[in-house]
Amino acid sequence: MLRLVRSSRAFHTSLIRAGTQANINPVAGKTADEVDVKIEPIPRHGEETETKRARLLYQSRKRGILETDLLLSRYAKLYLKDMTREELEEYDKLLDEPDWDIFYWATRNDNIKPCPERWAKSPVMEKLRELAENKEREVLRMPDL
């Protein structure tokens, strides 16, 4: 005879469960759709410029979302080697933002995710937006290392 056994756990393992309103975060009192999880970046004090360039190149290529990988890896290939220390810092801060936010800001999808003031006039974002327009109409791929 076959018996159905329901598993129960003493803790909640998932933040999102099919978008139901019953999924309340007991800590914040919000539904799963309203929960903001912000992981602060690791502070990197005294990082050498070449080490920072290598890290930023890696972080530009390995984002996890193909669209953002393509944009940022092309940007890094074109501009990273000539960036000043201040531009590297600004680009580093941009890479701390969520992938989809960067993609929407770069492609000017303000109806989905408006670009915040801190990035709207940024030289880094301006170059990224220019690159995202793909005026040459070329087929994009990950640049070689």
Swiss-Prot record:
Family according to the record: Belongs to the SDHAF2 family.
InterPro entries: SDH (IPR005631), SDH_sf (IPR036714), SDHAF2 (IPR028882)
Record's function text: Plays an essential role in the assembly of succinate dehydrogenase (SDH), an enzyme complex (also referred to as respiratory complex II) that is a component of both the tricarboxylic acid (TCA) cycle and the mitochondrial electron transport chain, and which couples the oxidation of succinate to fumarate with the reduction of ubiquinone (coenzyme Q) to ubiquinol. Required for flavinylation (covalent attachment of FAD) of the flavoprotein subunit of the SDH catalytic dimer.
GO biological process, one term: tricarboxylic acid cycle
Gene3D superfamilies assigned to the protein according to its UniProt record, in alphabetical order: Flavinator of succinate dehydrogenase
UniProt-listed Pfam families: Sdh5
Predominant localisation class: mitochondrion
Protein name in UniProt: Succinate dehydrogenase assembly factor 2, mitochondrial
Subcellular location: Mitochondrion matrix
Cellular-component GO terms for this entry: mitochondrial matrix; mitochondrion
Subunit structure of this chain's protein: Interacts with the flavoprotein subunit within the SDH catalytic dimer.
Domain of life of the source: Eukaryota
Miscellaneous note of the record: This protein may be expected to contain an N-terminal transit peptide but none has been predicted.
Record's keyword terms, sorted: Chaperone, Mitochondrion
